[in-house]
Amino acid sequence: MRRYEDKHIPVMPKEVIEHLIWKKDGIYVDCTVGEGGHTLLLASISPDIFVIGLDIDSEVLNIAEKNLSSFTNVKLFKSSYVDLPVVLKALNIEKVSGILIDLGISTYQLKAEGRGFTFNRDEPLDMRMNLEQKKTAYDVVNFYSEKELADIIFKYGEERFSRRIARSIVNSRPINSTLELVEAIRKALPPQEIRKRKRHFATKTFQAIRIEVNGELSNIENFLNNVPDLLEIGGRLAVISFHSLEDRLVKHFIKNSNKLRQIVGPIIPSKEEIDENPRARSAKLRIAERI
């Protein structure tokens, strides 16, 4: 039996089901299938529910296909959530009853060798969600200017030592692996800063580089702009975010939309869930309704 560290556990499953499902014969979309945890829960509610699942990561989608093979009311697509309108058009579906998106990185992506998302072992600098795209973390780390690096580390990582870290990265080039990058970050930070941080000192910089490689924030904006026209009246949007940049984007979009209203959130995981699944500790769930 796999431990929680090795197995992807869906975040806030009860809360997602309680607030997303309002029609037990509706069409629902899981925009980030991962290993299929949330998708399985949605499909299990009723055989009359139809679930469309998307994921841009072909490796993790293969796992989901195996996990969901017994369900006849699920259809999976290798596609980015940004392209949801294209997928629905191909299925001749104009409106759906609910849309779920989990913006966190999957356990598989962290644990699979060679993906470069983790700072806990030595791997090539990759960090691509979509293995078919060309830009990798290696390109960002080795070819961005010092100013460009400082800007993205500050903006996407909310790292106050961004300039020092960018300078250290440039001075350490070429950087070929994750642990070489960790060492460059370590050199830039005061020892007392490293000691006092609750999370690994490289977390913020790795987050920033991953966001840059995958264009995550612009993708979220594009996705959100599409959502209102894809939901039927009364339809629900459920967004699980894992850091303040994502949550602010979602919060402000819903607040400023004349087609959506927030009905629940932000919900955070219970202490019991965090004990079972530490990955959930920084998650926030917001639910909006199409009006």
From Swiss-Prot:
An annotated GO BP: rRNA base methylation
Coiled coil segments of this chain: none
Keywords: Cytoplasm, Methyltransferase, rRNA processing, S-adenosyl-L-methionine, Transferase
Any one GO molecular function term: rRNA (cytosine-N4-)-methyltransferase activity
Catalytic activity, reaction form: cytidine(1402) in 16S rRNA + S-adenosyl-L-methionine = N(4)-methylcytidine(1402) in 16S rRNA + S-adenosyl-L-homocysteine + H(+)
Enzyme class: transferase
EC number(s) from the headed UniProt entry: 2.1.1.199
A Pfam family that the UniProt record links to this protein: Methyltransf_5
Domain of life: Bacteria
HAMAP family for this protein: 16SrRNA_methyltr_H
Function: Specifically methylates the N4 position of cytidine in position 1402 (C1402) of 16S rRNA.
Protein name as it appears in the record: Ribosomal RNA small subunit methyltransferase H
Native organism: Thermosipho africanus (strain TCF52B)
Gene that this sequence comes from: rsmH
